[in-house]
């Protein structure tokens, strides 16, 4: 099954996440099919907190990709804002 989830980047104590389309069997930070955007939980001031390619997100959802709980919440919150 294909899933849309976060993969961690950044350094120790300074997390940064990429929204990736990946096979659900691969490791969290392992191989991925496509990168759809990023999430920066420690963004300050004018820094961008979330960026998502909505066109590609809708494409992958149409192909049957399942979003993780956290990604679904981020997308929902971004749409409301």
Swiss-Prot record:
Pfam families: Ribosomal_S16. SUPFAM superfamilies: Ribosomal protein S16 (SSF54565). InterPro entries: Ribosomal_bS16 (IPR000307), Ribosomal_bS16_dom_sf (IPR023803). This is Small ribosomal subunit protein bS16. It comes from Teredinibacter turnerae (strain ATCC 39867 / T7901). PANTHER family: 30S RIBOSOMAL PROTEIN S16, SMALL RIBOSOMAL SUBUNIT PROTEIN BS16M. The keyword 4Fe-4S does not apply. GO terms for cellular component: cytoplasm; small ribosomal subunit. Disulfide bonds: none annotated. One of its GO terms (biological process) is translation. Keywords: Ribonucleoprotein, Ribosomal protein. It comes from the Bacteria. GO terms for molecular function: structural constituent of ribosome. The gene is rpsP. Belongs to the bacterial ribosomal protein bS16 family.
């Amino acid at each position: 099954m294909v899933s849309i989830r976060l993969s961690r980047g950044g350094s120790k104590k300074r997390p940064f996440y990429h929204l990736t389309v990946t096979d659900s069997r691969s490791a969290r930070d392992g191989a991925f099919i496509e990168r759809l955007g990023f999430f920066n939980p420690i963004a300050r001031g004018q820094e961008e907190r979330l960026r998502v390619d909505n066109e590609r997100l809708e494409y992958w959802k149409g192909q049957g990709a399942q979003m993780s709980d956290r990604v679904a919440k981020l997308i929902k919150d971004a749409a409301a804002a």
